Swiss-Prot record:
Catalytic activity: tRNA(Ser) + L-serine + ATP = L-seryl-tRNA(Ser) + AMP + diphosphate + H(+); tRNA(Sec) + L-serine + ATP = L-seryl-tRNA(Sec) + AMP + diphosphate + H(+)
Gene3D superfamilies: Bira Bifunctional Protein, Domain 2 (3.30.930.10), Serine-tRNA synthetase, tRNA binding domain (1.10.287.40)
Record's protein name: Serine--tRNA ligase
PROSITE patterns listed in its UniProt record: AA_TRNA_LIGASE_II (PS50862)
A molecular function (GO) term: ATP binding
Enzyme class label: ligase
Gene (UniProt): serS
One Gene Ontology CC term in the entry: cytoplasm
Species, as recorded: Pseudomonas aeruginosa (strain ATCC 15692 / DSM 22644 / CIP 104116 / JCM 14847 / LMG 12228 / 1C / PRS 101 / PAO1)
Protein backbone atom coordinates (compact mmCIF):
# COMPACT_ATOMS: atom_id res chain seq x y z
CA UNK A 1 0.00 0.00 0.00
CA UNK A 2 1.21 3.48 -0.82
CA UNK A 3 1.59 6.08 1.91
CA UNK A 4 -1.98 7.45 2.31
CA UNK A 5 -0.64 10.89 3.17
CA UNK A 6 1.39 10.97 -0.04
CA UNK A 7 -1.63 9.98 -2.13
CA UNK A 8 -3.88 12.54 -0.42
CA UNK A 9 -1.46 15.46 -0.52
CA UNK A 10 0.34 14.83 -3.85
CA UNK A 11 -2.21 12.99 -6.02
CA UNK A 12 -1.03 14.56 -9.29
CA UNK A 13 2.60 13.53 -8.74
CA UNK A 14 1.57 10.02 -7.68
CA UNK A 15 -0.72 9.73 -10.72
CA UNK A 16 2.10 10.70 -13.08
CA UNK A 17 4.39 7.98 -11.71
CA UNK A 18 1.62 5.38 -11.75
CA UNK A 19 0.79 6.29 -15.35
CA UNK A 20 4.17 4.87 -16.38
CA UNK A 21 2.84 1.53 -15.14
CA UNK A 22 -0.32 1.89 -17.21
CA UNK A 23 -2.38 2.57 -14.08
CA UNK A 24 -4.85 5.45 -14.09
CA UNK A 25 -5.31 6.97 -10.65
CA UNK A 26 -8.72 8.55 -10.04
CA UNK A 27 -7.27 11.87 -8.92
CA UNK A 28 -10.62 13.68 -9.02
CA UNK A 29 -12.20 11.19 -6.63
CA UNK A 30 -9.22 11.27 -4.27
CA UNK A 31 -9.23 15.07 -4.20
CA UNK A 32 -13.00 15.11 -3.60
CA UNK A 33 -12.68 12.63 -0.73
CA UNK A 34 -9.83 14.63 0.76
CA UNK A 35 -11.92 17.81 0.67
CA UNK A 36 -14.79 15.97 2.34
CA UNK A 37 -12.46 14.53 4.95
CA UNK A 38 -10.98 17.93 5.79
CA UNK A 39 -14.43 19.55 5.98
CA UNK A 40 -15.90 16.88 8.23
CA UNK A 41 -12.73 16.75 10.35
CA UNK A 42 -12.77 20.52 10.86
CA UNK A 43 -16.46 20.53 11.78
CA UNK A 44 -15.95 17.60 14.14
CA UNK A 45 -13.08 19.33 15.93
CA UNK A 46 -15.17 22.51 16.27
CA UNK A 47 -18.11 20.54 17.67
CA UNK A 48 -15.85 18.74 20.13
CA UNK A 49 -14.46 22.06 21.37
CA UNK A 50 -17.97 23.53 21.69
CA UNK A 51 -19.21 20.42 23.50
CA UNK A 52 -16.33 20.59 25.94
CA UNK A 53 -17.13 24.25 26.59
CA UNK A 54 -20.83 23.45 27.14
CA UNK A 55 -19.95 20.63 29.53
CA UNK A 56 -17.79 23.01 31.53
CA UNK A 57 -20.58 25.61 31.51
CA UNK A 58 -23.03 23.02 32.90
CA UNK A 59 -20.88 22.59 35.98
CA UNK A 60 -20.60 26.33 36.50
CA UNK A 61 -24.36 26.85 35.98
CA UNK A 62 -25.12 24.14 38.53
CA UNK A 63 -22.99 25.95 41.11
CA UNK A 64 -24.94 29.15 40.45
CA UNK A 65 -28.26 27.33 40.67
CA UNK A 66 -29.23 28.15 37.09
CA UNK A 67 -31.41 26.10 34.74
CA UNK A 68 -29.05 23.72 32.91
CA UNK A 69 -31.68 22.08 30.67
CA UNK A 70 -30.80 24.19 27.58
CA UNK A 71 -27.12 23.40 28.04
CA UNK A 72 -27.83 19.67 28.41
CA UNK A 73 -29.89 19.76 25.22
CA UNK A 74 -27.00 21.43 23.39
CA UNK A 75 -24.56 18.78 24.64
CA UNK A 76 -26.89 15.96 23.51
CA UNK A 77 -27.35 17.57 20.09
CA UNK A 78 -23.62 18.01 19.66
CA UNK A 79 -23.04 14.42 20.73
CA UNK A 80 -25.38 13.23 17.99
CA UNK A 81 -23.62 15.47 15.45
CA UNK A 82 -20.23 14.13 16.57
CA UNK A 83 -21.42 10.55 16.10
CA UNK A 84 -22.65 11.42 12.61
CA UNK A 85 -19.32 13.11 11.86
CA UNK A 86 -17.47 9.97 12.97
CA UNK A 87 -19.65 7.83 10.70
CA UNK A 88 -18.90 10.15 7.78
CA UNK A 89 -15.16 10.07 8.50
CA UNK A 90 -15.21 6.27 8.75
CA UNK A 91 -17.04 6.04 5.41
CA UNK A 92 -14.60 8.41 3.71
CA UNK A 93 -11.62 6.57 5.18
CA UNK A 94 -13.12 3.24 4.15
CA UNK A 95 -13.42 4.36 0.54
CA UNK A 96 -9.87 5.75 0.57
CA UNK A 97 -8.54 2.51 2.06
CA UNK A 98 -10.35 0.45 -0.58
CA UNK A 99 -8.82 2.62 -3.31
CA UNK A 100 -5.36 2.33 -1.76
CA UNK A 101 -5.56 -1.48 -1.71
CA UNK A 102 -6.04 -1.45 -5.48
CA UNK A 103 -3.18 0.94 -6.30
CA UNK A 104 0.15 -0.65 -7.36
CA UNK A 105 3.55 0.36 -6.02
CA UNK A 106 5.43 3.37 -7.34
CA UNK A 107 8.32 2.43 -9.66
CA UNK A 108 11.83 3.34 -8.54
CA UNK A 109 13.53 6.09 -10.53
CA UNK A 110 16.03 3.58 -11.95
CA UNK A 111 13.30 1.41 -13.54
CA UNK A 112 13.08 1.65 -17.37
CA UNK A 113 9.87 3.31 -18.52
CA UNK A 114 7.79 1.26 -20.94
CA UNK A 115 4.38 -0.23 -21.60
CA UNK A 116 5.16 -3.95 -21.76
CA UNK A 117 7.85 -6.64 -21.92
CA UNK A 118 9.23 -5.21 -25.16
CA UNK A 119 10.64 -2.32 -23.12
CA UNK A 120 12.49 -4.53 -20.64
CA UNK A 121 16.25 -3.94 -20.62
CA UNK A 122 18.78 -6.76 -20.76
CA UNK A 123 21.37 -6.22 -18.04
CA UNK A 124 23.73 -9.16 -18.60
CA UNK A 125 24.09 -12.69 -19.91
CA UNK A 126 25.89 -15.69 -18.50
CA UNK A 127 26.95 -18.75 -20.45
CA UNK A 128 26.56 -19.61 -24.11
CA UNK A 129 23.63 -21.68 -25.40
CA UNK A 130 24.86 -25.11 -26.47
CA UNK A 131 24.88 -26.08 -30.14
CA UNK A 132 23.46 -29.59 -30.65
CA UNK A 133 24.47 -31.83 -33.56
CA UNK A 134 21.15 -33.67 -33.43
CA UNK A 135 17.48 -32.71 -33.46
CA UNK A 136 16.61 -31.22 -30.10
CA UNK A 137 13.67 -32.73 -28.21
CA UNK A 138 11.54 -30.75 -25.79
CA UNK A 139 11.19 -31.79 -22.14
CA UNK A 140 7.83 -33.44 -22.80
CA UNK A 141 9.28 -35.82 -25.40
CA UNK A 142 12.32 -36.49 -23.22
CA UNK A 143 10.26 -37.17 -20.11
CA UNK A 144 7.52 -39.24 -21.72
CA UNK A 145 10.06 -41.54 -23.34
CA UNK A 146 10.05 -43.91 -20.36
CA UNK A 147 6.79 -42.74 -18.78
CA UNK A 148 8.67 -40.72 -16.19
CA UNK A 149 6.83 -37.53 -17.09
CA UNK A 150 3.15 -38.36 -17.47
CA UNK A 151 0.69 -35.60 -18.36
CA UNK A 152 -2.08 -37.98 -19.46
CA UNK A 153 -2.41 -39.60 -16.04
CA UNK A 154 -2.09 -36.22 -14.34
CA UNK A 155 -5.00 -34.95 -16.45
CA UNK A 156 -7.05 -38.01 -15.48
CA UNK A 157 -6.38 -37.24 -11.82
CA UNK A 158 -6.65 -33.45 -11.79
CA UNK A 159 -7.35 -31.98 -15.22
CA UNK A 160 -5.17 -29.74 -17.38
CA UNK A 161 -1.95 -28.03 -16.25
CA UNK A 162 -0.76 -30.74 -13.86
CA UNK A 163 2.18 -33.14 -14.13
CA UNK A 164 2.92 -36.59 -12.75
CA UNK A 165 6.64 -37.33 -12.31
CA UNK A 166 8.03 -40.79 -11.62
CA UNK A 167 11.33 -42.57 -11.28
CA UNK A 168 14.56 -40.71 -12.12
CA UNK A 169 12.76 -37.52 -13.18
CA UNK A 170 10.90 -37.33 -9.85
CA UNK A 171 14.24 -37.87 -8.14
CA UNK A 172 15.91 -35.19 -10.27
CA UNK A 173 13.10 -32.77 -9.39
CA UNK A 174 13.66 -33.47 -5.68
CA UNK A 175 17.42 -33.18 -6.10
CA UNK A 176 17.06 -29.71 -7.61
CA UNK A 177 14.98 -28.46 -4.68
CA UNK A 178 17.40 -29.92 -2.12
CA UNK A 179 20.38 -28.44 -3.94
CA UNK A 180 18.77 -24.99 -4.00
CA UNK A 181 17.82 -25.04 -0.32
CA UNK A 182 21.27 -26.25 0.72
CA UNK A 183 22.97 -23.57 -1.38
CA UNK A 184 20.89 -20.72 0.01
CA UNK A 185 21.22 -21.83 3.63
CA UNK A 186 24.89 -22.86 3.60
CA UNK A 187 26.35 -20.19 1.33
CA UNK A 188 23.88 -17.31 1.16
CA UNK A 189 22.88 -17.00 4.81
CA UNK A 190 19.16 -17.78 4.60
CA UNK A 191 17.20 -19.44 7.38
CA UNK A 192 15.17 -22.39 6.14
CA UNK A 193 11.47 -22.34 6.98
CA UNK A 194 8.65 -24.82 6.56
CA UNK A 195 5.43 -22.86 6.20
CA UNK A 196 1.70 -23.61 5.91
CA UNK A 197 0.44 -24.08 2.37
CA UNK A 198 -2.94 -22.64 3.35
CA UNK A 199 -3.24 -19.05 4.56
CA UNK A 200 -6.00 -16.67 5.58
CA UNK A 201 -7.06 -13.62 3.59
CA UNK A 202 -5.14 -11.04 5.70
CA UNK A 203 -1.84 -12.71 4.81
CA UNK A 204 -2.61 -12.41 1.08
CA UNK A 205 -3.73 -8.82 1.55
CA UNK A 206 -0.44 -8.13 3.31
CA UNK A 207 1.65 -9.22 0.34
CA UNK A 208 -0.71 -7.72 -2.24
CA UNK A 209 -2.49 -10.70 -3.83
CA UNK A 210 -5.80 -9.65 -2.28
CA UNK A 211 -8.15 -8.07 -3.00
CA UNK A 212 -7.05 -7.35 -6.57
CA UNK A 213 -5.97 -10.82 -7.75
CA UNK A 214 -8.41 -13.19 -6.05
CA UNK A 215 -9.30 -14.86 -9.36
CA UNK A 216 -5.71 -16.14 -9.59
CA UNK A 217 -6.04 -18.02 -6.28
CA UNK A 218 -7.53 -21.32 -5.17
CA UNK A 219 -9.89 -20.80 -2.22
CA UNK A 220 -11.08 -23.39 0.28
CA UNK A 221 -13.97 -22.67 2.62
CA UNK A 222 -16.23 -24.44 5.07
CA UNK A 223 -19.48 -23.20 6.54
CA UNK A 224 -18.83 -21.25 9.71
CA UNK A 225 -15.08 -21.06 9.13
CA UNK A 226 -12.85 -18.39 7.62
CA UNK A 227 -11.84 -18.98 4.00
CA UNK A 228 -8.37 -20.37 3.43
CA UNK A 229 -6.32 -19.94 0.26
CA UNK A 230 -3.63 -22.20 -1.21
CA UNK A 231 -0.44 -20.16 -1.41
CA UNK A 232 0.51 -18.92 -4.90
CA UNK A 233 4.08 -18.55 -3.61
CA UNK A 234 5.91 -18.96 -0.30
CA UNK A 235 6.48 -15.20 -0.46
CA UNK A 236 3.08 -14.91 1.21
CA UNK A 237 3.82 -17.04 4.25
CA UNK A 238 7.48 -16.05 4.62
CA UNK A 239 6.91 -12.29 4.38
CA UNK A 240 3.98 -12.41 6.79
CA UNK A 241 6.20 -13.91 9.49
CA UNK A 242 6.91 -10.30 10.50
CA UNK A 243 3.33 -9.05 10.09
CA UNK A 244 2.30 -6.82 12.99
CA UNK A 245 5.78 -6.90 14.56
CA UNK A 246 8.19 -4.19 15.64
CA UNK A 247 11.65 -5.65 15.09
CA UNK A 248 14.88 -4.63 16.74
CA UNK A 249 17.21 -3.04 14.18
CA UNK A 250 19.87 -5.58 15.18
CA UNK A 251 17.64 -8.37 13.84
CA UNK A 252 17.88 -7.00 10.30
CA UNK A 253 18.32 -8.29 7.72
CA UNK A 254 16.09 -11.31 8.12
CA UNK A 255 16.59 -13.81 5.29
CA UNK A 256 14.15 -16.70 4.88
CA UNK A 257 14.02 -19.50 2.32
CA UNK A 258 11.40 -22.20 1.82
CA UNK A 259 10.63 -25.00 -0.62
CA UNK A 260 6.88 -25.28 -1.16
CA UNK A 261 4.35 -26.24 -3.77
CA UNK A 262 2.62 -23.20 -5.26
CA UNK A 263 -0.94 -23.08 -6.56
CA UNK A 264 -2.23 -20.71 -9.23
CA UNK A 265 -5.41 -20.72 -11.27
CA UNK A 266 -3.61 -19.12 -14.25
CA UNK A 267 -6.88 -17.31 -14.95
CA UNK A 268 -5.26 -14.99 -17.48
CA UNK A 269 -3.14 -17.62 -19.22
CA UNK A 270 -5.73 -19.33 -21.40
CA UNK A 271 -4.04 -20.85 -24.43
CA UNK A 272 -0.50 -20.01 -23.28
CA UNK A 273 2.12 -22.71 -22.64
CA UNK A 274 -0.45 -25.49 -22.70
CA UNK A 275 2.21 -28.14 -23.42
CA UNK A 276 4.49 -29.37 -20.68
CA UNK A 277 5.59 -27.95 -17.34
CA UNK A 278 6.20 -24.28 -18.11
CA UNK A 279 2.82 -23.11 -16.76
CA UNK A 280 1.11 -25.31 -14.17
CA UNK A 281 -1.66 -25.01 -11.59
CA UNK A 282 0.66 -26.72 -9.09
CA UNK A 283 4.42 -26.35 -9.14
CA UNK A 284 7.31 -26.34 -6.68
CA UNK A 285 9.42 -23.30 -5.98
CA UNK A 286 12.25 -22.37 -3.68
CA UNK A 287 11.45 -18.85 -2.49
CA UNK A 288 13.79 -16.31 -0.91
CA UNK A 289 12.50 -13.43 1.22
CA UNK A 290 14.45 -10.65 2.89
CA UNK A 291 13.26 -8.14 5.52
CA UNK A 292 15.72 -5.25 5.57
CA UNK A 293 16.54 -1.74 6.74
CA UNK A 294 15.10 0.69 4.16
CA UNK A 295 18.52 2.23 3.60
CA UNK A 296 19.89 -1.07 2.27
CA UNK A 297 17.01 -2.47 0.21
CA UNK A 298 18.31 -1.71 -3.28
CA UNK A 299 21.71 -3.13 -2.41
CA UNK A 300 19.87 -6.15 -1.00
CA UNK A 301 18.03 -6.57 -4.32
CA UNK A 302 21.34 -6.93 -6.14
CA UNK A 303 22.42 -9.57 -3.61
CA UNK A 304 19.13 -11.45 -3.80
CA UNK A 305 19.35 -11.54 -7.59
CA UNK A 306 22.94 -12.79 -7.39
CA UNK A 307 21.76 -15.59 -5.06
CA UNK A 308 19.26 -16.75 -7.69
CA UNK A 309 21.86 -16.44 -10.45
CA UNK A 310 24.28 -18.63 -8.51
CA UNK A 311 21.89 -21.58 -8.81
CA UNK A 312 21.94 -21.32 -12.60
CA UNK A 313 25.69 -20.84 -12.70
CA UNK A 314 26.36 -23.97 -10.65
CA UNK A 315 23.95 -25.90 -12.86
CA UNK A 316 25.81 -24.44 -15.87
CA UNK A 317 22.60 -23.25 -17.49
CA UNK A 318 22.86 -20.22 -19.80
CA UNK A 319 20.68 -17.32 -18.71
CA UNK A 320 20.14 -13.60 -18.97
CA UNK A 321 19.02 -10.92 -16.51
CA UNK A 322 16.39 -8.34 -17.45
CA UNK A 323 15.47 -5.13 -15.67
CA UNK A 324 11.71 -5.03 -15.99
CA UNK A 325 10.13 -1.84 -17.27
CA UNK A 326 7.41 0.05 -15.42
CA UNK A 327 4.61 -1.58 -17.40
CA UNK A 328 5.79 -5.16 -16.86
CA UNK A 329 6.47 -5.15 -13.12
CA UNK A 330 4.34 -6.99 -10.60
CA UNK A 331 1.74 -5.14 -8.53
CA UNK A 332 3.80 -4.78 -5.34
CA UNK A 333 7.26 -4.24 -6.81
CA UNK A 334 9.15 -0.98 -6.98
CA UNK A 335 12.00 -2.62 -8.93
CA UNK A 336 12.34 -6.11 -10.44
CA UNK A 337 14.94 -8.23 -12.18
CA UNK A 338 13.81 -11.30 -14.13
CA UNK A 339 16.14 -14.23 -14.76
CA UNK A 340 15.48 -16.09 -17.98
CA UNK A 341 17.05 -19.49 -18.68
CA UNK A 342 17.84 -20.84 -22.14
CA UNK A 343 15.29 -23.42 -23.36
CA UNK A 344 16.76 -25.17 -26.45
CA UNK A 345 13.49 -26.56 -27.86
CA UNK A 346 12.01 -23.05 -27.94
CA UNK A 347 15.27 -21.44 -29.04
CA UNK A 348 14.77 -18.63 -26.56
CA UNK A 349 15.12 -17.57 -22.94
CA UNK A 350 12.19 -18.21 -20.57
CA UNK A 351 11.54 -16.71 -17.14
CA UNK A 352 12.75 -18.83 -14.26
CA UNK A 353 12.99 -16.27 -11.46
CA UNK A 354 11.63 -12.85 -10.59
CA UNK A 355 13.51 -10.87 -7.92
CA UNK A 356 11.78 -7.79 -6.53
CA UNK A 357 12.20 -5.01 -4.03
CA UNK A 358 8.77 -4.05 -2.71
CA UNK A 359 10.04 -1.16 -0.60
CA UNK A 360 7.60 -0.39 2.23
CA UNK A 361 4.56 -1.35 0.10
CA UNK A 362 3.95 -4.74 1.72
CA UNK A 363 5.22 -3.62 5.12
CA UNK A 364 2.59 -0.88 5.31
CA UNK A 365 -0.17 -3.40 4.50
CA UNK A 366 1.21 -5.81 7.12
CA UNK A 367 2.31 -3.15 9.64
CA UNK A 368 5.77 -4.72 9.74
CA UNK A 369 8.17 -2.30 11.40
CA UNK A 370 11.54 -1.95 13.08
CA UNK A 371 12.65 0.46 15.76
CA UNK A 372 14.97 3.06 14.25
CA UNK A 373 17.95 3.24 16.64
CA UNK A 374 18.54 6.92 15.80
CA UNK A 375 15.01 8.11 16.58
CA UNK A 376 13.76 5.31 18.81
CA UNK A 377 10.54 5.31 16.78
CA UNK A 378 8.98 2.42 14.82
CA UNK A 379 9.39 2.71 11.05
CA UNK A 380 8.34 0.45 8.19
CA UNK A 381 10.82 -2.18 7.01
CA UNK A 382 11.45 -2.94 3.34
CA UNK A 383 10.62 -6.39 1.94
CA UNK A 384 12.18 -8.29 -0.96
CA UNK A 385 11.39 -11.61 -2.56
CA UNK A 386 12.70 -13.79 -5.35
CA UNK A 387 12.52 -17.31 -6.74
CA UNK A 388 15.63 -19.28 -6.11
CA UNK A 389 14.39 -21.00 -8.32
CA UNK A 390 11.15 -22.32 -9.80
CA UNK A 391 11.90 -26.04 -9.52
CA UNK A 392 9.75 -27.29 -12.40
CA UNK A 393 11.12 -24.78 -14.89
CA UNK A 394 14.65 -25.57 -13.72
CA UNK A 395 13.92 -29.24 -14.37
CA UNK A 396 12.75 -28.31 -17.88
CA UNK A 397 16.01 -26.43 -18.47
CA UNK A 398 18.15 -29.30 -17.17
CA UNK A 399 16.34 -31.93 -19.24
CA UNK A 400 16.67 -29.93 -22.44
CA UNK A 401 20.17 -28.50 -21.99
CA UNK A 402 21.66 -31.80 -20.79
CA UNK A 403 19.97 -34.07 -23.36
CA UNK A 404 22.01 -36.42 -25.53
CA UNK A 405 21.41 -37.77 -29.02
CA UNK A 406 19.87 -41.02 -27.73
CA UNK A 407 17.36 -39.13 -25.58
CA UNK A 408 19.18 -39.75 -22.31
CA UNK A 409 19.97 -36.93 -19.86
CA UNK A 410 23.34 -36.20 -18.30
CA UNK A 411 23.07 -35.31 -14.62
CA UNK A 412 24.65 -31.92 -13.80
CA UNK A 413 27.79 -32.27 -11.71
CA UNK A 414 26.37 -30.43 -8.67
CA UNK A 415 23.33 -32.73 -8.58
CA UNK A 416 25.22 -36.03 -8.56
CA UNK A 417 25.51 -36.14 -4.73
CA UNK A 418 21.71 -35.92 -4.59
CA UNK A 419 21.31 -38.65 -7.23
CA UNK A 420 23.45 -41.33 -5.53
CA UNK A 421 26.19 -40.68 -8.06
CA UNK A 422 23.99 -41.44 -11.08
CA UNK A 423 25.56 -39.76 -14.10
CA UNK A 424 22.97 -40.42 -16.81
CA UNK A 425 19.22 -41.05 -16.70
CA UNK A 426 17.25 -42.63 -19.51
Amino acid sequence: MLDPKLVRTQPQEVAARLATRGFQLDVARIEALEEQRKSVQTRTEQLQAERNARSKAIGQAKQRGEDIAPLLADVDRMGSELEEGKRQLDAIQGELDAMLLGIPNLPHESVPVGADEDANVEVRRWGTPKTFDFEVKDHVALGERHGWLDFETAAKLSGARFALMRGPIARLHRALAQFMINLHTAEHGYEEAYTPYLVQAPALQGTGQLPKFEEDLFKIGRDGEADLYLIPTAEVSLTNIVSGQILDAKQLPLKFVAHTPCFRSEAGASGRDTRGMIRQHQFDKVEMVQIVDPATSYEALEGLTANAERVLQLLELPYRVLALCTGDMGFGATKTYDLEVWVPSQDKYREISSCSNCGDFQARRMQARYRNPETGKPELVHTLNGSGLAVGRTLVAVLENYQQADGSIRVPEVLKPYMAGIEVIG
